[in-house]
From Swiss-Prot:
It is found in: Nucleus. GO terms for molecular function: ATP binding; deoxyadenosine kinase activity; deoxycytidine kinase activity; deoxyguanosine kinase activity; deoxynucleoside kinase activity. It holds the Pfam family dNK. The lineage of its organism: Eukaryota, Metazoa, Chordata, Craniata, Vertebrata. ATP binds at residues 31-39, 191-195, 243-245. InterPro entries: DCK/DGK, Deoxyribonucleoside_kinase, DNK_dom, P-loop_NTPase. Belongs to the DCK/DGK family. This is Deoxycytidine kinase 2. SUPFAM superfamilies: P-loop containing nucleoside triphosphate hydrolases. It comes from the Eukaryota. Expressed at high levels in adult intestine, spleen, thymus and testis with lower levels in skeletal muscle and eye. In the embryo, expressed at higher levels until day 10 with lower levels in later stages.
């Protein structure tokens, strides 16, 4: 298994010195809806002071308010009374382009946030992102286009905007590796129904199957065409999480060990 590659430092970030940039590893955790990403990032956050987790900014896409500091500030859509995630599922043809554009923007903002002082002092600092700007495009936006919810003009504009935006911040948002939580669409549906988020009530199995296919061709079979050079050879760790691990200490230890090996081998 190859180690996560070091990113090319094309320019100094305002709050990072070159030594820290060379040490820092940025890893995205990818997977279908309800695959277990949130459960895993909570485990990672507790495991090491040298690991920092950036959760999916779902609170900025809907009317959910949590006690976490990064979720207290209302997004523009919330201030205007909007719940973009709910709007997407209710009227996907109307809101798909709007949602995917805002989702990508919110992820870029999350990845550009200043590094914590504690992580800056770490010998082997790692940032784990719950999904990435790449799955926004190659999984979710692509699926919405193929299902007819994003039209050809919107898709062309989205791809152009996405490529331009990522190229502007390439050195700051490039990933060093991807962890793919692999599970069946049927298992995801079970977990989705169990957690009972209001915005997800309309999700059906076919939608999860389509997202599963996208993840498989991109991260497992590696047959999907991608437009960013760093993605073509990026190290990928595939973890089978079809069996629930939320309350399974043995499975949790196994997953942590696999991730540690991925980071250091």
């Amino acid at each position: 298994m190859s180690a996560p590659a070091k990113r090319r430092c094309r320019g100094p970030a305002a709050d990072l010195d070159s030594s820290f940039q060379k040490r820092l590893r940025k890893i995205s955790i990818e997977g279908n809806i309800a695959a277990g990403k949130s459960t895993l990032v909570r485990l990672l956050e507790k495991h090491s002071d040298e690991w920092e987790v950036i959760p999916e900014p779902i609170a900025k896409w809907c009317n959910i308010q949590t006690s976490e500091d990064e979720c207290k500030e209302l997004s523009t859509s919330q201030k205007s009374g909007g719940n973009l995630l709910q709007m997407l599922y209710d009227k996907p043809t109307r809101w798909a382009y709007t949602f995917q554009t805002y989702a990508c923007l919110s992820r870029v903002r999350a990845q550009l946030k200043p590094i914590s002082a504690k992580l800056h002092e770490a010998e082997h600092p790692v940032q784990f992102f719950e999904r990435s700007v790449y799955s926004d495009r190659y999984v979710f936006a692509s699926n919405l286009f193929e299902s007819g919810n994003i039209n050809e003009t919107e898709w062309a504009i989205y791809q152009d905007w996405h490529s331009w935006l990522l190229n502007q911040f390439q050195s700051e948002i490039e990933l060093d590796g991807i962890i793919y939580l692999r599970t069946t669409p049927q298992k995801c549906m079970e977990r989705l129904q169990k957690r009972g988020r209001k915005e997800e009530e309309g999700i059906d199995l076919e939608y999860l199957e389509n997202l599963h296919y996208k993840h498989e061709t991109w991260l497992y079979e590696k047959t999907m065409r991608v437009d960013f050079e760093n993605l073509k050879e990026i190290p990928i760790l595939v973890l089978d999480v079809n069996e629930d691990f939320k309350n399974d200490k043995i499975k949790q230890e196994y997953l942590i060990d696999e991730i540690k090996s991925f980071l250091t081998s």
